[in-house]
């Protein structure tokens, strides 16, 4: 797809504030997907707003992973499960819940939905690594460090809608029609972007293969900022080749000056 440069957020509180603005501005629908989702005293305004939007006629769909209630971060001390949102008209799907049927089929327990994305009215698309929970957005200076990116793009929103509706329809008896949410796109962004989606059961491609291909095609610069800087032999070879052909290559490995990561948070 073609996109322009996104808004970038590296602070949970700042993203929380921007997320509230985007949700408050929704007129037609809000599609939200997260890995760990739960409320807390600091996040109550967000979930209150989702309830208000649903009551006002805005379609609100929320997908959270089935492990959300087993959150082992600092969130566990203040969390409130989100099942109550259904009473206000919010459409809530718990992806692969921790149930007896999954226990007798253990392979299904390891497949989690780790994506975090949001689509507003088919024109705003957000993606990144922040969960919708206390430790990602509501813990002040103790917030985990991650990032979110907001694109004003109908074209990218349509791709996200495809993914969201597929996940929803696989897990819910209340089906969504993606054509009800998509919009026609005539925009042409300044940059090319790719959405890489890997299904652990169906996909024959790998993340390392994707990164290797991008690195091999680079001509001027590469910047990597991984959370866990582990690469396989093919990626290492691609990076060496890039350096040898004169590509400016930087890898930043994150450290936490607060000592937070070392405490297991």
Give short role names for the model-derived ranges.
Residues 1-265:
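Charged, low-complexity intrinsically disordered terminal segments
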């Amino acid at each position: 797809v073609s996109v322009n440069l996104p808004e970038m957020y590296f602070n949970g509180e700042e993203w929380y504030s921007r997320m509230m603005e985007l949700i408050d501005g929704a007129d037609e629908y809000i599609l939200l997907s997260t890995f760990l989702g739960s409320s807390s005293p600091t996040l109550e305004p967000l979930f209150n707003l989702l309830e208000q939007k649903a009551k006002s006629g805005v379609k609100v769909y929320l997908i959270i992973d089935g492990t959300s209630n087993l959150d082992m971060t600092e969130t566990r001390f203040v969390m409130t499960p989100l099942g109550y949102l259904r009473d206000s008209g919010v459409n809530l799907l718990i992806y692969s819940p921790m149930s007896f049927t999954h226990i007798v089929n253990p392979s299904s327990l390891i497949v989690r939905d780790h994506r975090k994305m949001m689509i507003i009215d088919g024109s705003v698309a957000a993606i990144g690594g922040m969960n919708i929970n206390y430790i990602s957005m509501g813990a002040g200076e103790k917030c985990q460090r991650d990032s979110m990116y907001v694109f004003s793009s109908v074209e990218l929103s349509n791709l996200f809608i495809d993914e969201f509706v597929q996940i929803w329809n696989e897990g819910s008896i209340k089906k969504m029609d993606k054509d009800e949410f998509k919009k026609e796109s005539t925009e042409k962004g300044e940059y090319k972007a790719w959405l890489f989606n890997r299904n652990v059961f169906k996909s024959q491609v790998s993340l390392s293969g994707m990164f290797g291909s991008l690195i091999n095609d680079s001509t001027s610069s590469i910047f990597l900022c991984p959370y866990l800087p582990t690469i396989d032999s093919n990626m290492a070879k691609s990076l060496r080749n890039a350096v040898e052909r004169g590509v400016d290559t930087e890898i930043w490995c994150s450290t936490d000056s607060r000592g937070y990561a070392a405490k297991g948070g």
